[in-house]
C-alpha cells in the first residue's frame, strides 16, 4: 500500500528524476523511494507517463532539493542584442536575468575559478576575440571566510554598487568613442565606483575588488562592441582583454589633450600685440601654439595664422593690416620679420628721446652780437623766464621811481629811453644817457 501511494504521488513531486535512482543506491530505512522488484514494471509505466506529460507541458516544474539526485546543469544566458536598450535604469536580479542584463547586474555570474558559484562564462559579443572560459581577472583570489582577518591586504569595496542607475548608450561608431566614454565614466561614478577611476594624472584612490573588476569588464563589453572600438583600444585589449582601466586612463588623458586643443584655438583666435613685450617673445608664443596643434594632427596654414595675428595688432603695428590686405601669398615668417623691424625702430627711438631733449634745450640760449665788430661783447639773453621775473617796462618803471631824483622830475625819467651802444674803438668809449642836474 505504501509503495502504491508513493507511485501515485511521485509524478507530482519528482518527475523523471527516478531514472537516476536505483534501489541499491538508496537504503530502505532512509529513503521511501525504495521499491520491490515486483513493482518495477508499474514504476516504469508511471515514469513513462510522467515523461510524456512533461514533454507536452510548456513550463518546468519545481524539483525539491535532494542530495541523492543529480543536480541540473545551469542554463546558459543568451547573448544580448547590441542595440539600444529600452530599460531606463538598473533592474532587480530576477528581472535582469529575464531581460539579459544579468551579465553586469550580477558580476559574480562571470565566474572564472573554483570559488565562483557558476561554472559558465557568458560572452556577450561574438566579435570579442576572447576564449570561452577565461582565466581569473586577478592573480589573487578572495580568501576564505575564516582567513579574512589574517590577510588585510585584499582590497575591499567601500560602497555597494548602486542600483537604478541610468546606463550609458551603446557605442554606434568608432568616431563617437571619445564622447561615449564620457557617459560610461559618468555611469561608473553614479554606480559608486568613482574612486577606482583614474583621474587626470592617472592616479586612483584605491584598488578595485574582483567583483568591481568583473562589473566594469562586463558593462564595457555590453555597451561597447569590439568591432566599433578605436584601433588603440583594440591594441590594449588584445594584449590584456580585461585591462579596461588602462583604456579609461588613456581616454582621460586624451580628454585633457582635447581640452588643450580647445584652449590653443581660443588663444590663437584672441591674439593681441601692441609692442609691450618683445617681438621675439610674441613669435615664440605663437609658434608654440601652432606646433602643439600640429602634434595633435591639426595643421594651421600660414594664411590663417597671419590673419589671426593681423587682427590682434594695435598701436604702431596696426598699419600692417593695410599692407597685408591685398596680399594673397602670406608668409608667417615674413610677418614676424616686419613686426620685429617695427619693434626695433620703436626701441631705438625710445632710447634717443632723452638726448634729443637735452640738445634742444641747449639751443634755446640765443646769442646776439652787433655787426661790423671785431672784438664784441656778447649779451646772452635767456628767453625762458621764471615765474618771479617781470617785463622790461616794469623793471624800468621801478628803477625810475626808486631813484633819488624821482621826486623832482618823475615824468621826465619815465619818458627817457634806455639804450646801450657798443663802439669798437681803442678807448672802447660807451655813451650813456645824459641826466639833468638840478
From Swiss-Prot:
GO MF entries: RNA binding
Keyword RNA-binding attached: yes
UniProt keyword terms in alphabetical order: Cytoplasm, RNA-binding, Transposable element
Ribonucleoprotein keyword on record: no
Extent of Low complexity compositional bias: 369-381
Annotated region (RNA-binding), positions in chain: 295-397
Main location: cytoplasm
InterPro entries to which the protein is assigned, alphabetical: TYA
Site (Cleavage): 397-398
Start and end residues of each stretch annotated as Disordered: 1-88, 366-397
Any one biological process term the GO annotation gives: viral translational frameshifting
Coiled coil segments of this chain: none
Superkingdom in the source lineage: Eukaryota
Residue spans of biased composition, Polar residues class: 1-39, 49-60
One term under GO cellular component: cytoplasm
Subcellular location: Cytoplasm
Self-association state and partner proteins as the record states: Homotrimer.
More about this protein: Retrotransposons are mobile genetic entities that are able to replicate via an RNA intermediate and a reverse transcription step. In contrast to retroviruses, retrotransposons are non-infectious, lack an envelope and remain intracellular. Ty2 retrotransposons belong to the copia elements (pseudoviridae).
Domain notes: The C-terminal RNA-binding region of CA is sufficient for all its nucleocapsid-like chaperone activities.
Role this protein plays: Capsid protein (CA) is the structural component of the virus-like particle (VLP), forming the shell that encapsulates the retrotransposons dimeric RNA genome. The particles are assembled from trimer-clustered units and there are holes in the capsid shells that allow for the diffusion of macromolecules. CA also has nucleocapsid-like chaperone activity, promoting primer tRNA(i)-Met annealing to the multipartite primer-binding site (PBS), dimerization of Ty2 RNA and initiation of reverse transcription.
Stated name of the protein: Transposon Ty2-OR1 Gag polyprotein
Classification of source organism: Eukaryota, Fungi, Dikarya, Ascomycota, Saccharomycotina
Amino acid at each position: 500500500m505504501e509503495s502504491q501511494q508513493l507511485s501515485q504521488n511521485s509524478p507530482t513531486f519528482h518527475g523523471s528524476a527516478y531514472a537516476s535512482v536505483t534501489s541499491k543506491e538508496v537504503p530502505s530505512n532512509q529513503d521511501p523511494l525504495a521499491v520491490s522488484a515486483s513493482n518495477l514494471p508499474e514504476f516504469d509505466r508511471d515514469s513513462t507517463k510522467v515523461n510524456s506529460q512533461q514533454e507536452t507541458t510548456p513550463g518546468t516544474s519545481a524539483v525539491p532539493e535532494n542530495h541523492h539526485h543529480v543536480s541540473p546543469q545551469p542554463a546558459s544566458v543568451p547573448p544580448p542584442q547590441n542595440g539600444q536598450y529600452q530599460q531606463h535604469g538598473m533592474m532587480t536580479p530576477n528581472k535582469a536575468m529575464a531581460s539579459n542584463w544579468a551579465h553586469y547586474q550580477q558580476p559574480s555570474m562571470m565566474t572564472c575559478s573554483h570559488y565562483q558559484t557558476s561554472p559558465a562564462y557568458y560572452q556577450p559579443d561574438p566579435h570579442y576575440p576572447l576564449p570561452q572560459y577565461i582565466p581569473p581577472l586577478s592573480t589573487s583570489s578572495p580568501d576564505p571566510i575564516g582567513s579574512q582577518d589574517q590577510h588585510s591586504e585584499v582590497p575591499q569595496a567601500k560602497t555597494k554598487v548602486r542600483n537604478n542607475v541610468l546606463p550609458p548608450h551603446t557605442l554606434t561608431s568608432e568616431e563617437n568613442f571619445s564622447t561615449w566614454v564620457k557617459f560610461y565614466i559618468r555611469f561608473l561614478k553614479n554606480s559608486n565606483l568613482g574612486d577606482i577611476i583614474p583621474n587626470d594624472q592617472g592616479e586612483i584612490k584605491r584598488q578595485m575588488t574582483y567583483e568591481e573588476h568583473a562589473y566594469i569588464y562586463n558593462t564595457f563589453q555590453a555597451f561597447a562592441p569590439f568591432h566599433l572600438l578605436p584601433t588603440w583600444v583594440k591594441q590594449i585589449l588584445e594584449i590584456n582583454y580585461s585591462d579596461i582601466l588602462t583604456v579609461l586612463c588613456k581616454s582621460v588623458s586624451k580628454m585633457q589633450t582635447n581640452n588643450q586643443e580647445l584652449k590653443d584655438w581660443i588663444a590663437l583666435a584672441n591674439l593681441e600685440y601692441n609692442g609691450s613685450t618683445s617681438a621675439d617673445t610674441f613669435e615664440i608664443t605663437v609658434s608654440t601654439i601652432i606646433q602643439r596643434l600640429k602634434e595633435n594632427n591639426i595643421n594651421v596654414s600660414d594664411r590663417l595664422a597671419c590673419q589671426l595675428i593681423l587682427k590682434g595688432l594695435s598701436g604702431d603695428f596696426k598699419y600692417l593690416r593695410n599692407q597685408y590686405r591685398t596680399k594673397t601669398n602670406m608668409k608667417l615668417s615674413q610677418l614676424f620679420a616686419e613686426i620685429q623691424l617695427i619693434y626695433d625702430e620703436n626701441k631705438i627711438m625710445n632710447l634717443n628721446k632723452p638726448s634729443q631733449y637735452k640738445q634742444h634745450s641747449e639751443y634755446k640760449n640765443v646769442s646776439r652780437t652787433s655787426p661790423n665788430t671785431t672784438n664784441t661783447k656778447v649779451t646772452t639773453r635767456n628767453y625762458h623766464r621764471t615765474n618771479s621775473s617781470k617785463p622790461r617796462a616794469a623793471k624800468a618803471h621801478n628803477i625810475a621811481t626808486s631813484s633819488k631824483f624821482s621826486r623832482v622830475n618823475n615824468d621826465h625819467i619815465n619818458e627817457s629811453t634806455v639804450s646801450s651802444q657798443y663802439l669798437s674803438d681803442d678807448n672802447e668809449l660807451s655813451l650813456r644817457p645824459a641826466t639833468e642836474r638840478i
